[in-house]
């Protein structure tokens, strides 16, 4: 029961709970944020791009919730105490921090006056900050799901990678269409996403 993970980690029950709970919550947060951004944006192309991305986040959140373990008090994994941190938790922490940063950048719903600049910032945060970190998380979870019993979670990860990669490429292409041509680093990220490799994380 090994793969290319040098640490030999695999999905114990607690690790599966931590990952599916964390990812489901982050997908839910992203569904809400992207949904708000899509309606608040003042550029039609941004609205048209972010609305389906929001829907994809919501669908993945629902799929991940099916893996939450039954615990005393119900199935709400978020109510269960977190286990000790492991080396595999890094991508989840990076993703949570990215969502916090995005929320701070654009402000809570109803407290920001949206302009074209704000709309472009929302699309930029989606393409260059949020989606690349989801890709990293799903690739890490796919690596951990290396036991025969993990087939269902591997399938969820494969579907999520396909959706998220497509959203990443679409959002980046829309940035270019709206006049923000990707530099070499963004082109490199697009190519890596298409090849199934980890997109690089650039300074924001």
Language-model features: locations:
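Iron-associated oxidoreductase/ferritin-like identity signal
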Residues: 1-204
């Amino acid at each position: 029961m090994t793969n290319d993970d040098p640490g030999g980690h695999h999905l114990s029950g607690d690790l599966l709970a931590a990952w599916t709970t964390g990812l489901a919550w982050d997908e839910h947060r992203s569904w809400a944020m992207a949904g708000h951004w899509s309606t608040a944006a003042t550029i039609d192309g941004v609205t048209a791009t972010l609305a389906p991305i929001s829907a994809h986040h919501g669908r993945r959140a629902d799929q991940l919730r099916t893996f939450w373990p039954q615990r005393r008090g119900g199935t709400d994994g978020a109510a269960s105490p977190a286990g000790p941190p492991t080396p595999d938790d890094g991508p989840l922490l990076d993703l949570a921090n990215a969502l916090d940063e995005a929320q701070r950048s654009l402000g809570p719903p109803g407290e920001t006056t949206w302009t074209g600049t704000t709309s472009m910032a929302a699309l930029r945060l989606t393409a260059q900050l949020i989606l690349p970190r989801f890709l990293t998380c799903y690739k890490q979870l796919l690596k951990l799901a290396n036991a025969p019993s993990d087939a269902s979670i591997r399938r969820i990860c494969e579907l999520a990678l396909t959706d998220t990669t497509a959203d990443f490429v679409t959002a980046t292409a829309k940035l270019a269409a709206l006049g923000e041509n990707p530099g070499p680093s963004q082109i490199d990220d697009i190519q890596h996403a298409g090849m199934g490799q980890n997109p690089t994380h650039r300074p924001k």
